[in-house]
Amino acid sequence: PSRTGYVSTYPENDGDNDIYPTDPARAFQPLTTVLEAGKMLQGKATGLVFTCEFPHATPADCSAHSYNRGKYDWIAPQMVHNDINVVIGGGVSILTKDMEDYLLANGYNVYKNDLKGMRADNNQKMWALYGDKEMAYDIDRNPEEQPSIEEMTRKAIDKLSKNPNGFFLMVEGSKVDWAAHGNDPVGMATDFLAFDRACGAALEFARNNGETAVVIVPDHGNSGISLGR
């Protein structure tokens, strides 16, 4: 996926997550991501916010390594064990009891379809998941059950910004592309606007902080819409 190029600065084979391209000299060695490097080398806090299920391509590209982006049974445990401070997104059914037990044993608070719990949480390590797999499109979202991507972004920034060494946060409006594939222009536009509000939250923090870079990029930046018969 293209996200690997962003977070590792290295091209890869289509369908992989953060491993070197097929080459006998490299033999599928993992590529370190900017999230992992920031954490290991500079002690930065790290976070992921998204609306797809957590082992899906873009969140996984920041925090896991696999020759097949669809192998959630490999990818999900890697993400759980990667010591990411804050994870907010979809995928309640994918978080197994063993994974949840590991998180709880290592100081995380875990919330599953618990909006009030997430809002009240003051711990610096948190996983909050909503929806059996992916979260709802913003236009279909029940605001009493699932947070907006803007709220998720603000919650993550509030937690991560307490680290004196700074932080790395990836925010993905995951389902803009899904709606485009599904010929759903209303879903696409409303999810894009929801993501725009999340970008506004990040830019607001950056302006006030003065030491934060915000990079906004598309990985499905299609140039037009066409309707076929």
Where are these regions (language model features)?
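A post-motif C-terminal structural segment
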Residues: 1-4, 10-13, 18, 55-229
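Mobile, glycine-rich extracellular loop/lid and propeptide segments
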Residues: 6-13, 24-39, 44-61
